[in-house]
């Protein structure tokens, strides 16, 4: 620049010279000068051009050097080269940036996207920026992710914008490099800061460089200017040290534990469009709030500084007495330590304006990070002064003046400036006060640039740090009285007013100080004490400002009493500075806590003193006088605490010389000492624990190991070890206890098992003896009834004893008689005849006699037999018919070992299929064979064809809670009554009960028969019969039982019984046959004690009617009934017979039992349980002699014998020794009878089936002939359509040609009529299969004849097609479509008329057994003639299967060689046009699969497009595995389904898996035949072409839904295992027609359970198969599955 300037001056001078010389010289001289000037001008111009070239080249070189310096860091760190020379393009994909930050901090970026797409690069840049934030960069220091985008292809973007964006990236790299330099864990290459000088500015670069290498002096604090985000301790110090790093400065390295170069204000200036000045790019160092200042105190303790005078900031010779603004101050060129500068100061200014005060925003964001600065030594802190400053202005960041204002550091009293001045007010004092206050002014001026909120925030932060109770040690209030210090009255101090003393300065009284209090208090003020002291101070200021009572310590020599009012000691002891709040932690300063008057303390602290203090109020005349309390000279006995305590009691008089104890005795003082010692120990332990906790867990804990002694650590370790040992021992004890309990339980179990085994052996012995002793000749049941009636007519009232309670004695003589047994049986007989109206094949006379049998058995056999021969006739009763198979089956279950018992589900699901009795049963062969029944009652060889309504469903027996509680309470009441009467009775376990929830059929009027029952009995009749009934009831035994009757709620039906009111109570007058009352075992003459827990008094008919009406509304009636006579045993029973109203001509037969209350028929009516041995006990003599403990023992043994309490049949009574009178089954005779009955059943079913077949065949022939007649009119149209179905022509009969053509036409019209097609699909599958007789002609002859007919028909049709095609080309397609629509409607109506859907529930199970057809064949329409071709042999195998492969090769060849005609080509063209406009739906969505359900499939004829297909599958071949017959995958010799019952084979066994029973084929060598076909045909994958010319089963296009959901005798088939679904819990998907056992509801790929709670409801269905979500996704994505 100087050269250029010289050239310009020289040129100007030359032109001036030329002007002058032009006037003064000659022409020659002028020419010379002109040439010289021109040459000089040329030289200047060339110099200017050369300068521009050199400058631009230098700029290029400088920019290249900068870029190389910026890129060298990336290259050195990542060890990778830039892909291009362009800096931006190399960083655009973000890979280098991610590699760079991963090198600086390994693992911060887990995954880098190395794709070449722009999105991948943007993703990497975003990840890089997030990692920078994790390292510690602020958001303002990061560039935008779009700054690296390529802007060269944008016309509107200028080069300056591109440079600005690159500059932002470089700024981020710069701060990242600085972070790397300050990271102690990073030992790689560092950033070249000189390369960024042009970018950042030389001033900031120089300042940052200086801050990186801080000079150090000998007094080093031991800490370095390092950045370490993960480590809390400090590392190696830097190499240099400067004056501002001294320990007395707030900016020192000791006080600020870390220096951070990060800030909210960063190098973002260039992005906003202005150049980034160093002010906005600079950040000053913040103190770390989490670091402790232990090192600061440690260093200050080692190197104490001499105390500077407190008034060093007052005006003197070198300082002006008034404030002078900084610009007007005198410049001082000499720089000494007092005038040092710090670049890190936010308010530092220089003449060149390098730094400014724009850093104010940092205060608001980071001021909370400033730590609490604590003064620690007597030395005052040094105040930094600015350059050229005559008067000191403290800096709030680095200066310690603020700390000195708040700290308890007290200057030496000897250095007080006004110690020897006269104590009077002078103008100098006023001037001093003004000057002193002006020294505070600059401290507040520093805040002028801040907002009010930031100022309050800063002050709040300082005050919180100082007054925070968390960083201070807690004071124990019980550690005794605190030191009472003198109150300093500063009102006389010059420069102070009373208002200045808001917080009184507390100074220790050296004479009265208590070192123990200072030790235990650790110099912290108790908040309670501080509050109380403030009240105490304000209270005392009102009286007088002079301390009144002073306790003096004894001195040798003469006693000196100072004049308190005249003496200047208090004034001389004024501290120079105000102590706002005393800070803790000074090791050499002890400022005791002020302790006020005891009565000013809060009550919770006063309560902890041992001595009660009373406030002594001095008299008014003595209030102005001062007291001087002189202690004793006997210092050995003197106690400062005692003197302090006694000082409140002492008067104004001088105490005697000798020391006398005050109100506290010696015991109190000893107790005080003990309390002090305990408090001191507790306080020490608490401190130790808090320090350890802060050391281990806290961020604020001390980092010095000197705070925790090795002894404390060892004690803590020992405590932890002891705690661990305690826990370990407790665990061992618990484990040992558990083992002992387990061993005891095993012992008890073994003893119970042995007892049970003995009891079983005893029972078997008893049964054998009972069978051997039965020698009485057998009688028929009818003869026994007649004998019993004759005996009843001749016999008088028997003398029977009755066991009754005390309340019944008063009512004995008042009970009128009820009906006799014969009358009751007659009434029940009449009701039975009225109720039985349904026709049956059983003769009606049996039903009329059965009512007598039913009632008389229950009354007659219950009476005690008069002869011992009758008592010992169990063998003859083996021929009796049983209604109580429920009890007998449970007795079988109870007497068996547990391994032989059937579960509840087996007993319930055994109802599904009948089983013959010729096969052996698993279990004990000596026991009778278990049997069940399906549609008829099968007991003892008799058949009852009762067709139950489908809503009579057996539910799982479960007692209602209120019923079970009621039964238990009743039984307990009866036991208590028995013990009071000293009559020992043995209550049997609760009788079996079950609840059947179903709707009952209404068979009776909606009237209450209880009121009409009152009119049935005449007065004379009551008078005649009542004495007899009264006597009989009085001498009878009775039993109390509870009967629960359920029926459909809301129906106005009575429960089927009538009552009669009597003086003793309410009695049952009659029971209607077939009513719920009969099924609930209610009998005539039963006394009704209560209904629904409501008792009724005599003739309380209104309440009775209300209760009955309420019971009818709810459908639930609970009656407490008392039954008299031998039939009633002294036991409390519970009957829950939830009965339906059944209409039958013949009810189930009865088996005679000795105790009717035990022959309860609960759920056997519905669930048809297994028959078994009738095993009961009626020996009352032995029961009466048993004790309560024996009862409990029997109950316990019965519980373990039955296994669990949740079985269908609860506990049963244990037989006793005296049981020869029991009725026992004759097992062999019963087995023979059951076999005969089974054969009879088979014969009846066969006859019924034959009749049904004949009807179906006739109907089928009529429908076929009608359909052929209707379709003959439209033969021409059908032949044209048949030309497109050439492959199906060889597989059809000639008689069916027109029928199939109609279906083909229908499929075309369904494209236009989608709604009608859906209706046809729903209607077609409802047709049932019709079977052919075995006497038809052989199948092979039919096949040969059919093939010949097809060949002839084919030739004729081809000729007709050629003729028809020429004629049809002239017609419009619209007319044809209209005619076809009419044909379709008429045909569908005719077909539907001749169709009769056969209900699957009406077809017996043996239909499948006698015929060899698959059950799926029944789903076909009867309108097809395919089933005519079936012929089965005796074994059920299809003979047609042997002829499958007999098709000649010529026939198959002829199918391939068929050439489509012109009409077919035209049809294909039309379909192609329609396909273009119609989107194809080749998906397998569930909506399209709904048409594949079992009841919504049309008959799938091969080769013909189904209505449901429409245009979806036009291109798919017609003969692939879509239409593959399911039997191709089956064994040839086994055609019947595994679920079809074939009685020629051994019966399948009932297998229980997970408490669910299903059928399993007995021949283990033969797999289930249809299972494989179902699973393979549903995958939708073409495996093999069908070799058969015909299809005789549902096509595979239905996805196997018909096979899996076919009904076998009304039972569904599991879609997974192909077994009968049964009556257990199942998973059914109605929309798709899928049914599964719970254990079969699993994924077909991985076979994981889909019904469990772990997998939830994640079920996917594809091709009618279940998948879990994972397998389905793999299946969709094409990845291999477990299959």
Swiss-Prot record:
LIM zinc-binding domain boundaries: 1612-1678
Modified residues (Phosphothreonine): 913, 932, 949, 956, 1048
Placement of covalent cross-link Glycyl lysine isopeptide (Lys-Gly) (interchain with G-Cter in SUMO2): 1405
Domain PDZ span(s) in chain numbering: 1042-1128
One annotated GO biological process: positive regulation of transcription by RNA polymerase II
CDD domains: LIM (cd08368)
Keyword Cytoplasm: no
Segments forming domain Calponin-homology (CH): 64-181
Biased composition, class Basic and acidic residues, residue ranges: 749-791, 842-858, 1255-1276, 1308-1351, 1358-1388, 1396-1408
GO cellular component, one term: ubiquitin ligase complex
Polar residues bias: start-end ranges: 819-828, 859-875, 1282-1293, 1430-1451, 1481-1494, 1516-1542, 1573-1590
InterPro entries: CH_dom (IPR001715), CH_dom_sf (IPR036872), DUF4757 (IPR031865), LMO-7 (IPR029978), PDZ (IPR001478), PDZ_sf (IPR036034), SM22_calponin (IPR003096), Znf_LIM (IPR001781)
Molecular function terms, GO-annotated: metal ion binding; ubiquitin-protein transferase activity
Start-end of Low complexity biased regions: 961-973, 986-1012, 1591-1601
UniProt KW keywords: Acetylation, Isopeptide bond, LIM domain, Metal-binding, Phosphoprotein, Ubl conjugation, Zinc
Annotated region (Disordered), positions in chain: 312-343, 749-901, 947-1037, 1255-1604
Official protein name in the record: LIM domain only protein 7
Species: Homo sapiens (Human)
Species lineage: Eukaryota, Metazoa, Chordata, Craniata, Vertebrata
